[in-house]
């Protein structure tokens, strides 16, 4: 269980709070808007109405006691930037800030953010890949070059074993697991036989995955 500070209780911040709550973490939420604070109360341990660009207010929260600080302020990049910088000055262990544009990501990293999330860009990329290829069921970006795809078993692979296909040698792709009837099996061996009711969880470089699965 981690102690988390969430600054910005808008839609994205509220979803973060919900997920953190489900994972069993202790969450303190901060926002300038009382209505947004009330909306997030069911998912947090504590909440305060306050201005995160005020150093004294942030200091009163005991920033050094939090394992992670999320900055999910919407509508004011200036406030997000100032808050990010102040958090690091006050000894924050890890600051994760939200960006809405590429240039914002660069400024946030320069001003103290340890990591930057860009939900609109990440969702756009996921949707573009997911819904333009009928045989792609899910997609997780690892970094700019690597991803995990959940993909339908190609027709030519049906009835063959993982070892027989040897996609690691041919494409540099690792089969992490397979899914059948909604159940995931990560105990994949070279003897695992692929069937037409199976999807594959494959890890590799984008170019290799695109070539292998004709994405």
What are these regions (language model features)?
Residues 1-215:
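Cytosolic regulatory regions of ion transport systems
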